[in-house]
Amino acid sequence: MSVYVDDAFIPYRRGMLMSHMMADTTEELDKMADSIGLNRRWIQHAGSWKEHYDICKSKRMEAIGKGAIPVTQWVLNEMIRLKRAKHWK
């Protein structure tokens, strides 16, 4: 079981670049969010196969430093696709 962060680097306000953080389980995602100082209210699509956090570049680096696995946005998209397929079985 793992936590993953992508390399989307989507432009946000004031020059921020945002990525996505997701995990194999909600518990792992919450644990990593807590460890890097994210507010749990910031979770996107809680309890669904799309569950993730949007994180800035500095939080992405912090998550990697605490064990998150960096992946490309394409790999993360494939993981989401597989989660969705599993959900609808």
Can you say where each PLM-predicted feature lies in the sequence?
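A short, structured beta-strand/loop element
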Residues: A23-S48, G65
